[in-house]
Amino acid sequence: MKKIAIDAMGGDYAPKAIVEGVNQAISDFSDIEVQLYGDQKKIEKYLTVTERVSIIHTEEKINSDDEPAKAVRRKKQSSMVLGAKAVKDGVAQAFISAGNTGALLAAGLFVVGRIKGVDRPGLMSTMPTLDGVGFDMLDLGANAENTASHLHQYAILGSFYAKNVRGIEVPRVGLLNNGTEETKGDSLHKEAYELLAAEPSINFIGNIEARDLMSSVADVVVTDGFTGNAVLKTMEGTAMSIMGSLKSSIKSGGVKAKLGALLLKDSLYQLKDSMDYSSAGGAVLFGLKAPIVKCHGSSDSKAVYSTLKQVRTMLETQVVDQLVDAFTDE
């Protein structure tokens, strides 16, 4: 049985979206057991399943505007800290939260701990592509600054995940840069390029540009945390703007526009789905001793369900255990 702890109070639509996602996952997956951390009365209001679900009551929670490190130190009975502690103590095997990102990073580092040999855990998520396959990208903001050595480790971590969790036999690893030529970039990217090109355990395909990300040019994209977070927010904003603009144009375009939209209904839904983060799962804080996964703050029940499915696969493939062995052997 795979035991997964969840912060039921984290996120914009908690606990409703969290619990509804759990209801669906429990119904679909007979090999998972979920521990919900949060306000029992509020959780029970939406909980429809009773088997393989337990509630650990606490009224304390970390808010979105709390200072991350201080909140983790001071709010030891919060739903987030208790969930992370459950993983540390072996009560749960993985932890999910849609709450304060910085606080989750702090809880992951200070409570769960990083894998020996990993310098800086990175935040990794599977990003959408036009063909629906997606690519894994890290770091998406766990670290504001990185060294070439960090990017080298991210390439190994990302390749490991793509192969073992997503089932890509030989993942293509690309370095996000301001040009595809080998000589492009600042000193950080030039040094990182040399390290990645010399790494025998990955299939490094060279530099890639941001404009090509959604064209499936790579299975794993490596970048520093500052750039990665900026790219993530840009992709999210662009997707929202495109869909919003299409909707406005159809509404204001008269009968012809509405008829055209009706004829293109299936194609428009396909476009919407290709840009939808909710089916990809959450962002993994990769490099820790256990799977710690961050749901988007605005996650609905579908996104929570997808994240539970993702974590179930991570536990099934024992990707973190394999990583521990790999880095210990180095």
From Swiss-Prot:
Domain of life of the native organism: Bacteria
Keyword Lipid biosynthesis part of the UniProt annotation: yes
Keyword field: Cytoplasm, Lipid biosynthesis, Lipid metabolism, Phospholipid biosynthesis, Phospholipid metabolism, Transferase
GO molecular function, one term: phosphate:acyl-[acyl carrier protein] acyltransferase activity
Primary localisation category: cytoplasm
GO biological process: fatty acid biosynthetic process; phospholipid biosynthetic process
Record-linked Pfam families: FA_synthesis
Function comment: Catalyzes the reversible formation of acyl-phosphate (acyl-PO(4)) from acyl-[acyl-carrier-protein] (acyl-ACP). This enzyme utilizes acyl-ACP as fatty acyl donor, but not acyl-CoA.
PANTHER family cross-referenced by the UniProt entry: FATTY ACID/PHOSPHOLIPID SYNTHESIS PROTEIN PLSX (PTHR30100), PHOSPHATE ACYLTRANSFERASE (PTHR30100:SF1)
Name recorded for this polypeptide: Phosphate acyltransferase
Gene source species: Streptococcus agalactiae serotype V (strain ATCC BAA-611 / 2603 V/R)
Top-level taxonomy: Bacteria, Bacillati, Bacillota, Bacilli, Lactobacillales
